[in-house]
């Protein structure tokens, strides 16, 4: 029996209930931070601040802009590679991100920014919320084309809450250093999403196989997303670092790692094709792996050549993953990873976590290696202990992501969320009104063309993200 995909009441009701809840909760718990409040002039006098330029807004807003572009444009366009799923990729990414940032401001605020039971909202909160939603976008890539917007909203709501708890445990309880989010953002999002898609395994997804391929223009749109992400990733990894050398170093390390991953992924893509041709899937994704891999160690004394090595390894491993690992995961482990997030976020995230742990463990007192003494820690932890804490943070994140993904997958598996049948997946027309091209004149509707119409465009590449 076919499932009912008509969302006329379910989607509007869920959206309105969630937004009304946000309004009430913001009214009860959220206020402006001192830097954003009208009392800023009093704060200046108390702190002997001579210029408004010392307001944190002017330090953080450029980074916030870049991260915002990555979340709403970069991730959205990156997922438009499917030939008949562009509306859903962009539109649903927009929807879940809009819900996610509001819920993240509350959840992260309750965990990190409360004062007298109130959340004081400033530019740092906005960056943190966008970073949280980036993890949601990562998980979305695993289930792209196979879930309804109602399921995505529920998944976003649950994941943001779990992300905030995990982030608090790692960054504030264990004091794990993770400037670019290799652990808290990429590993958490990837393995949460992979676990959800494993639970939601579709036995007859082959019936939608044709729509899982790309065409020329869909690959171009996806490449736009890649370029947005690639350009702004240094800001993403350095946005929340301390002012000065730490933030400067994070941008440099990310810049170098990204550049190295481009050359490596191009080389590997050509080598792995029997005719030496490049696969657009690899170029869209593996070229970004360096940004993921250097995330944890971004603000550490990794050294530029170390960042290049990380990018080199991540680009190669990511490309190999698309060729060999994605088919294996689907055929043997029943993990249908639409966007190949395991290759772009999962494995490079694991590499980044290991690099961070090793770099921390071999830090030096004068700060010429690692970061322990330059950054400082409570409880007088030495570099070896910090390295072990970094490793434990990785294991804890994997456990929380997989357990949470299992719970969420079982909830989403219920048959009344408006999900499509297997043969209808990866098709915009299930949830969007499709406006076909019509004649410009109403009188021309009976006119038949005197010349043959153009043939339907066929996919130019047989490569997909989930063979």
Swiss-Prot record:
Single GO term (MF): ammonium channel activity
Glycosylation sites: 48
Basic and acidic residues biased stretches: 436-447
Main location: membrane
Reactions mediated catalytically: NH4(+)(in) = NH4(+)(out); methylamine(out) = methylamine(in); CO2(out) = CO2(in)
Alphabetically ordered keywords of this record: Ammonia transport, Cell membrane, Glycoprotein, Membrane, Transmembrane, Transmembrane helix, Transport
Extracellular topological domain: 31-61, 108-131, 174-179, 241-251, 304, 365-391
Membrane topology listed for this record: Multi-pass membrane protein
Post-translational modification: N-glycosylated.
Cellular location(s): Cell membrane; Apical cell membrane
Chain spans, region Disordered: 436-467
Any GO CC annotation of this UniProt entry: apical plasma membrane
Gene3D superfamilies: Ammonium transporter AmtB like domains (1.10.3430.10)
GO biological process: ammonium homeostasis; ammonium transmembrane transport
Keyword ATP-binding applies: no
Residue ranges annotated as Cytoplasmic topological domain: 1-9, 83-86, 201-219, 273-282, 326-343, 413-467
Family of this protein: Belongs to the ammonium transporter (TC 2.A.49) family. Rh subfamily.
Assembly behavior: Homotrimer.
PANTHER family, per database record: AMMONIUM TRANSPORTER, AMMONIUM TRANSPORTER RH TYPE C
Protein name as annotated: Ammonium transporter Rh type C
Originating gene: RHCG
